[in-house]
Amino acid sequence: MAEVTIKQLAEDVGAPVERLLKQMVDAGLEKRGEGDIVTDSEKQKLLAFLKQSHGESFSEPKKITLKRKTTTTLKASGTGANRSINVEVRKKRTYIKRSEAVNDIDAQKQQDIQRAAEEAAAKERETEVEVALQNEPGMEATAEVVESVQQEAANMDTQEAEAAPQASVDESVSATTAGGSQEKAGVAADQEAEDAQKSEARKTSKHRRNKEDSEVRREPADAEDLKRREKHKPKPAPQLKSSKVIAIEEDDSSEEAPRRARQRKKKSKVVQDRSVQPIVREVVISDTITVAELAQKMSVKGVEVIKRLMGMGIMATLNQSIDQDVAQLVAEEMGHKVKLLQEDAVETEVLESISFEGESKSRAPVVSVMGHVDHGKTSLLDYIRRAKVAAQESGGITQHIGAYHVETPRGMISFLDTPGHAAFTAMRARGAQCTDIVILVVAADDGVMPQTQEAVQHAKAAGVPLVVAVNKMDKEQADPDRVKNELSALDVIPEEWGGDVQFVPVSAHTGDGIDDLLEAVLLQSEMLELTAVPDAPGKGVVIESSLDRGRGSVATVLVQNGTLRHGDIVLAGEYYGRVRAMVNENGQNVQEAGPSIPVEILGLNGTPDAGDEFIVVPDEKKAREVAEFRQNKERQTRLQRQQAASLENLFENMGKGGVKELNIVLKTDVRGSLEALIGALAEIGNEEVQVKIIASGVGGITETDANLALSTQAIIVGFNVRADASARKIVEKEGIELRYYSVIYNIIDDVKKALTGMLAPEFREDIVGTAEVRDTFKSPKFGQVAGCMVLEGAVYRNKPIRVLRDNVVIFEGELESLRRFKDDVAEVRAGTECGIGVRNYEVKVGDIIEVFDKIRVERSL
């Protein structure tokens, strides 16, 4: 039991605090206020006092008997076969508790001492006392028995001075042996009294022999002195407490029984001293951890952790991930020690172990060509490379990041050709981040366009200097001053106007100004003082990645520092692998690639995202560990993002009709185009319809994609990829819609048309005529008929109507009949009287009948 205050104890027992304080004072416990602490020993003392005050006695000795039986088998050899003999050993032990009657023995002892002192004072000589003692047979034996009992009690007190009262043993002992044990206690008390009488008599006789002359005068003083000495004398047998248990083993010898009993008591004492304490564990918590994992680390049930989270206002399931801070609060609240684990320690260790020390040498600049679509970026690069790259692109537009390096008379330059279409915003941003100089191509006849502004923003965000190439100067509509004025509004000031941006007029068609452009680029690179360490391990960025059926995963990388060699172990984003082959932009195999050189590498176990950094690591095991760590981190982040999105949209979508979704399975040839398409399709739609990408990936359309589209009722979109034979068979058999595209414009337009067709129709009401009720009369065929005058427009028999009374719509329905004189007519124009029969409604004089028409309005996104 833990220590509690007097107030808490009073609440537990259901008694007033004042009454409890009075009872504690009566029991000899000094307590002043209700905030004082009550220990276990004080509780026991108070309980004993209350029981005595109610007439209950503690003098009943109790005992418990334990029986144990063991059976063994002995093999006896003799004539014939061996015989087995079963030997059964039975033991019985009885545990007896001495009662609280020892207090009565104390009082009896005091009376015996006083009586012995009085008798000793009355005797005159020592010889008379000795004769009296000799007349008592067995006295010496009794004294020896008492001394042995005292010695045993002293040993037991020494061994168990700190043992707590064994209340459970007291309650389990039977009360059937109360009488016999009380007789034994009485015999022990008589023996102690006789021993005390003998010792007091001897002391009194010795005192009287020394001072016979003052025997009469000091007789009362001697009696008081004996009482005072007996008061300070150590108490022998009565010191045994009620919690002391004597074990008697009936089949053991009298000498071994006390020893074994003491050993058992010592063991029980050790067990009792062990207080039940909660196990404090060291919980290692990573950046993200699920509720089930946290519960397992603390060795508790997951429900307990969920309850703690609910108390903190967090609703979570067993498999849901929680962040490190929340997990730390839960673990500390449950009494455990927390050790925060930085999961990226493995990644940091690998990256820090790679050294890029060495001699720095100048490197070629990496130049990105940016601009609006159809402004001539790729054509300009064609003229520089003396190649026809633009003719190979579908639709004449660039849909991938092309990486090339060109040897010029003035030095080597590496070019990155980025797409200009709006869907490739992320690809342009990646191109600006991994480049040194940006060539901004602006058509002289078109000026600054939206993607031109975006390219300027990307270049400024990356801190990359600009060189403006004013293209299409060979056209008659060319106006370079217009380009300068529009770019100056974007804070791109030409050098001629006092700025720091070089403007070079060029023509990709005729080649005019190309040399000046290269000169400007090399001049800008000299000002940047670009350097790298060629002897270090390779490091750079992934430009593009794709999945080739014959070659596997192919990644286009740009080496920014060090040298990438054939056979190196490359870690790129969430994937790793050994470089099995390296191919340059001309399709030639190379053994190494230095700084600023773009190459294609084969051998990765997946297609990394465009923009991921790659690095050469010395150990494949470390590379695998880092890649797996990144994959797990990305998966947990994605799950958390989905969970947060679902919780945010839970109440928004409550009560609303279901949003119509167009399910799409999207497959592309390269990773960059996949990201661009996913981003472009996600922007299409509104609160009624939207695009849902069921699955996406790089590579051809497989049987798995076809089965997934069949189960989700999705359409399959292939961008520069085709379906294999098994996938085509499923598509033809099940009637799945499969579409191939090579231009991104067409995908976006077709998806917009499909979503437009899914929109709910919208109707507009046009009022075509009004009529005023002048009179009403009954007709045996149609019931009530209203005589009306057509005020505006025309009244048609087959169109819906409204009835207005005091300019308030009171009825909406349809006409039952329309007559001009006695003839049924289809319409009645303005200024003409007619008879109108309204179905299921009675009109009054002065009402206005309004005829309207519902027109369906085509909706668009």
UniProtKB/Swiss-Prot annotation:
Principal subcellular localisation of the protein: cytoplasm
Location relative to the cell: Cytoplasm
Residue numbers spanned by region G1: 371-378
Extent of Basic residues compositional bias: 260-269
Domain tr-type G, residue spans: 362-531
Region span, G5: 507-509
Region named G2: 396-400
Residue segments, region G3: 417-420
Positions with biased composition (Basic and acidic residues): 115-128, 210-228
Chain positions recorded as GTP binding sites: 371-378, 417-421, 471-474
CDD domains: IF2_eIF5B (cd01887), IF2_mtIF2_II (cd03702), mtIF2_IVc (cd03692)
Matching HAMAP family: IF_2_B (MF_00100_B)
Protein name in the entry: Translation initiation factor IF-2
Organism: Hahella chejuensis (strain KCTC 2396)
